[in-house]
Amino acid sequence: MTPPGGEKPPYGEIFSVMMICCMAGTRLFGFLAERDPPEKFSRGLFAVAACALATPVALPGRPTWALAGFLAFELVVGAYFPAMGTLKSKIIPDAQRATIYNLFRVPLNVIVLLVLLSHLDTVQVFTAVVALLAAAAALQHALYVATVDYSKRVVAIESDKEPLVAV
C-alpha cells in the first residue's frame, strides 16, 4: 500500500481509522442486537468479513480498495466480539466457561504456529481466511436454524400443556 512517489504510508492514521471502525462496530452490534438476536445477524457478520478480506485478493494492486476492505473487516470485528460474548453466555454454562476456553487456546496456538512456520504467500493466506470465514457463516447459519427449531419445539410443547385447575 505504498502511495505514489514511494513515500511510506501514514501508518498512524491507518491504525487510527481502523480503531475507529472497530469502535463503530460495537455501536453496530448495539443497533443490530435491538432488532435481532446475535444468532441471526452473526451470519451476516461472517459473510461481510469474508467479502471484506477477499477484496485484496480479488483486486490486487488497488491499495484504496484493500484499505476499504480492511476497514470493513475492522467494523465487523467490532461487532463480532460483543456478539460472540453474548452467544457464549447463552450457550456455555458459567461453571465450565473458563475450562472450555482454555481447551481451545492450546490448539489455536498450535495452528497459529504452524501457519507462521509454513511461509505461505499473502494470496494463499487471504484465500484460506476467506474460506474459513465462509465456513463460519455456514456454521453460524446452522446454529441459528437449530436455535429457531428448538424455540419452536419449546413453544409447541408449552402450548400443548393443559392449564392447572384448582379443585
Regions found by a protein language model. Give the residues of each.
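Transmembrane alpha-helix termini and helix-breaking/packing motifs in multi-pass membrane transporters
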Residues: M1-G6, T26-D36, A54-A58, N109-A137
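Juxtamembrane helix-start elements in MFS-like secondary transporters
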Residues: G6-F15, R62, A66, Y101, ...
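Substrate-agnostic recognition of the 12-TM MFS/MFS-like secondary transporter fold
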Residues: F15-G30, L45-F46, G69-L117
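Hydrophobic alpha-helical transmembrane segments
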Residues: S16-A24, G44-A52, Q124-L143
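Juxtamembrane helix-start motifs in multi-pass secondary transporters
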Residues: P37-L45, I100, V125
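C-terminal transmembrane helical hairpin of 12-TM major facilitator-type secondary transporters
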Residues: E39-F81
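Multi-pass alpha-helical transporter architecture, strongest
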Residues: T127-V167
